[in-house]
């Protein structure tokens, strides 16, 4: 830092100059170089502020009035004024026109230095330029427009350089070359500072300029894309035409794919509901109620839904042999249709209907036996010639058996089954039937038990066993304990639910040891009666009488004056009653009962 710069900073602090004034003093110093453009740009931005504008212009006029020794102050002040007229606020030109006389006096500025060189000529030439600019308004307007465009261009270039420099420094952070490059280019930093907007007006202007440039770039991009529509010079087909030719082909392909998918979905639905073709394989239908052997070999012509039979209708009988198991599935045609209808076949193995009435079937060695089914009675003679379906839930028919069992079966009422398993809980009781010559009892028949309980006169009674029969003649000398122990008499009760149980004893077993309480007659005979002498009852001494507060006083102990007079009304007056005596005699109770104590009741408690 030079001596002049240090002296200038001290003056700024002593005179308490503002920021705008300090910048003007820095731009118009006595240094042998001109004012920096960045500093002049900041001062020009400050002129848009009213307060800063007054400070800037006041310091400029002070610099213009310096003496010849400080000719650099005057020359730099004129240079700054020229810059403010072109890039600053319009009020700068108005104020300069108002103070035009001060500027004109500088045309005669004279100063010759020690070397004899005229330094005033520079000031005079600069004053002429400023005066010509102030007098020609059209030129001033053109100069302002050109200066603003140049400033905006420099600001954009500075922003681009600054952003590139910042991006490069971010990418190369940590490398020593980044620090050297940043430190070795102070011009980039000054341009960046110059490009930054200092006021709101400049910022708005830069924003509008950026929008215009972006709009122009967008238009250029649209023109470059539109250039594909024009044919090229070598006769090749443009890309836009090829793209338009490919669009209908793509649409046709999409339509064909949609049509194929729709047709395939319709065919899938038709396949689901249509019956599957018959294949000569084992029966593997997924339908649990699918009856085998009823699948047509060929589909009826005309439609996929041919005439079919009701799966719940009775199945016609065939000529082939039948099975005794109702749920056996014969190996027949396979089907993938779970709920399809099955037409009736004219020929084939018959299907056993579990719900149809049964008929006599011939006994065949190859017939399967159902362990859970009822016994089947078959005949040795096949008079009918054809086998009929077997019903496991139907009643068995007559069969060839001995004459005795047949007669016993015919003796039963009509509708009753001789089978011991079949029992009608709601029917009348039927006599038991004989099987193989032996009388068979029913499950719920209690007649046998009744016959065993009731003694028939024709039968010999079973002898009852006694101790004599078991011990012999020596049993007569034994003591019979049953005769010694007497059972307590049962109290007669009307409770029907206590029959057969030991009746409760009428006496309290827990009060056997207590003495009986005196009866009312005993208490009456023991208490003194009316009209007895005050000495006490006859035969009872006075010394044996005790006082009891719970018993009333005897009438003989009440004085004669204590009786109520006849003149006392419902509401007695004061003094109607005699005052109570001072001492009342004690009531007398007999200490010993004149009647002897009652004998204790004989308790019948078996636990005492």
Curated annotation (Swiss-Prot):
This chain belongs to which protein, by name? Answer: Epsin-3
Record's compositionally biased regions (Pro residues): 346-363, 578-588
* Positions annotated to bind a 1,2-diacyl-sn-glycero-3-phospho-(1D-myo-inositol-4,5-bisphosphate): 8, 11, 25, 30, 63, 73
Q: What's an example GO cellular component term for this entry? A: plasma membrane
Which GO BP terms sit in this record? Answer: endocytosis
In this chain the UIM domain maps to 202-221
Source organism per entry reads Rattus norvegicus (Rat)
Q: Please name the gene that encodes this protein.
A: Epn3
SUPFAM superfamilies, A to Z: ENTH/VHS domain
Instruction: From the Swiss-Prot or TrEMBL record, state where the protein is found.
Output: Cytoplasm, Cell cortex; Cytoplasm, Perinuclear region; Cytoplasmic vesicle, Clathrin-coated vesicle; Nucleus
What keywords sit in the KW lines?
Cytoplasm, Cytoplasmic vesicle, Lipid-binding, Nucleus, Phosphoprotein, Repeat
Q: Tell me where in this chain the PTM Phosphoserine is found.
A: 184-185
Family annotation (InterPro entries): ENTH (IPR013809), ENTH_VHS (IPR008942), UIM_dom (IPR003903)
Q: Where are the sequence repeats?
A: 287-289, 310-312, 337-339, 353-355, 370-372, 495-497, 508-510, 605-607
Task: State where composition is biased (Low complexity).
Answer: 174-189
Family label? Belongs to the epsin family.
Q: Where is the composition biased (Basic and acidic residues)?
A: 214-229, 240-260
